[in-house]
Amino acid sequence: METETKQFGGGLKGVRYKYIDSDEYYTPIETVEKIFSKILPHVKEKKIWFPCDNEQSAFVLYAQKLGLNYKNSSDDFRKREDLFLWCDVVITNPPFTKIPILCDLIKEKKKDFVFIAPYVRMNAIMQRFLNVSFFYLPRLFYRPDNTIERIGVVAANSFGLTNNNPLPQHEKLICEYEDETRIPILNNIKFFPQDEIAPNKMYVPLTFAMYETKNWQRIRVQDRPKVNGKDKFRRLLIQKK
């Protein structure tokens, strides 16, 4: 399998990503177990569709083990109107280039979803589902040729994303932030200010989506906000309710 290596500038300078002729990655059972440990209480009574998975998929095998109500397919999901109508929730590790298409269909059909996605695809998801939640996953995947992928676009940042909101509420985040623009930019979610002293609006890291709070509304994803003329990493604009 031929590979081409490119290097991004800006905030990703020095980080290399692999572009290969297939963006398929197979999910190991350890990753599937981690996902279901987060979402099982929310999906165990629902009809689940695995749209990018054959009978040997770790998702399918684990769903069998749990006795879940599921269907799977490995053909073109755009042509499976029957399964879109049947299911309550879509769970898969989709080809990453197909994530925007799948998101558009899920939004149109008003279905819940749980995806595996790299950081570079989070913007496409959060633009369509602003209130999506996510959690970290093991950084290990298999290529179709059965080799292991530990570095590159998959492993750099691997997240499980869901609009099913399986994450606990986190009301008391305590943080510090830069106040160098009209809208402060928070650099570390671990130092989130208490609500009573927080500004009305803030740019926060996308890891804010790992927590739920009743007092903040998500407004939009900002690709590269600036502080003193310097680009920062992608941020989420939030506002007090």
Task: List each model region and its residues.
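Class I S-adenosyl-L-methionine-dependent methyltransferase catalytic core
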Residues: 1-91, 95-241
